[in-house]
């Protein structure tokens, strides 16, 4: 199934995450992942956790950015993988690792998790479309425009991940939401 017309859930990444995972609309000038005390939200991760799913969240950057680590651990995720989880030499800019590195890392974790025969949910947050753009030198983009190049790269990286995932035994029982 593919949707060709859709709207962004907000301007900032935190809006998209809370909208997609917890069904909260974007509230301008408000980050629903932050608070004096880490807020509890009911959504897909918490419901799946109650049903016995082992939930993982992958991000390219530092775990504390936007209070993501505390928020996601409080709200249904068991494991958080972030810049602190990756080798230091894999970091390419202030937002952490490249998309293809994160997808390959996530694939290894998903394969390990699948061997335990426990259902799981994995959320993979990529950040390559945030400046400063870093397109790997080996990637051959069809354009010279940096913003178009990074979109080409991001598209290639997710396609590469899906091609590799398709070869895994857990693929046939997996739903991908992009």
Predicted regions and their residues:
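Solvent-exposed soluble domains appended to multi-pass membrane proteins
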Residues: 1-178
């Amino acid at each position: 199934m593919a949707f060709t017309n859709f709207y962004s859930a907000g301007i900032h990444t935190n809006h998209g995450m809370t909208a997609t995972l917890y069904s909260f609309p974007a509230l301008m000038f408000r980050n629903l992942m932050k608070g004096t005390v880490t807020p509890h939200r009911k959504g897909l991760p918490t419901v799946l956790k109650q049903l016995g799913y082992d939930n993982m969240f992958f991000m390219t950057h530092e775990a504390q950015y936007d209070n993501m680590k505390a928020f996601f651990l409080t709200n249904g995720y068991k494991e958080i993988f972030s810049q602190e989880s990756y080798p230091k030499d894999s970091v390419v800019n202030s937002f952490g690792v490249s998309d293809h590195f994160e997808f390959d890392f996530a694939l290894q974790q998903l394969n390990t998790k699948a061997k335990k025969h426990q259902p799981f949910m994995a959320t993979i947050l990529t950040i390559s479309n945030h400046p400063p753009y870093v397109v790997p030198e080996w990637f051959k983009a069809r354009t010279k425009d940096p913003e178009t190049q990074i979109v080409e790269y991001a598209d290639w990286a997710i396609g590469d991940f899906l091609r590799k995932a398709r070869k895994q035994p857990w693929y046939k029982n997996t739903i991908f939401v992009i």
